[in-house]
Amino acid sequence: MIRPRMLRSLLALLLGATTGCTTIQLGAANLIETAEVPRTEVAYGEGPRQRYDVYRALDSIGRPLTTPAPVVIFVHGGSWESGDKRGYAWVGEALAQLGFVAVLPNYGLMPSTRFPEFVDDVARAVAHARARVTEWGGDTSRVVLMGHSAGAHIAALVAYDARYLATQGTTPAILSGFVGLSGAYDFLFDTKLLRRTFAGPPEREHDALPVHFVTPRSLRTLLVMGEDDRTVNPRNTRSLAAALRKAQVPVEEIWVSGTHGVSVGAFARINRGESEIVRRIAAFVRATP
């Protein structure tokens, strides 16, 4: 028989030690004590992947909240070429159980969708969801954009490069903050994947890096990074944090022992109650800017 403490340790090892983060590995920690959380799928465009799932905020005993709740829009990772919102349903459920409305969008993937089109998809989803959050019990003054890995890269571009939301007739000011989990923000185009994903005219490499779009008006930010990440170099987080501080933008950093899955893995049910990462993200989301 595996005792709960032993199981928690095994799953923490699985989540923290993976060099490549998969939804199977991360979702495994949610097979225990699963709970049904209401989910609604919404189309934000006509494309087959232009959909997002909404999870309604719940109180401490699993009932829908009756007061406006903070909103988290979570963008999944997958190296810009894989991943699906349903594979991260456990993140949506975790956020709902923390008392947040969770919105998980899909977006176009490589190779059929190229940069910057997949960022345009997420910007469109953000604007669409932000305009409707009150329908699901959301508080429009507290809408935080969060992403993991490649999803953090895409979300950061939407948060910092105002051109994306401008195409949707709005601005990053509709958001109350950005949370980046193990994200790529300032990288070299030194792999086949990166060169293929961001191929194009010379200015495309500049436009692909969120760090280039930090200004004094950028959103307050919380960055989480595994100290031993081998998938995304930790210098990405250090560089973005330095740029934000130089611009005098409020920024918090959480550095934890572990690799690429340790940041988003904090939302796994087996980890959630003891996770300093989850506690600090929840406090950040609940805060009024």
Regions found by a protein language model. Name each.
Residues T22-P64:
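N-terminal cap/lid segment of alpha/beta-hydrolase-fold proteins
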Residues G47, G183-F213, L219:
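Mobile cap/lid helix-loop segments that gate and shape the active-site cleft of serine hydrolases
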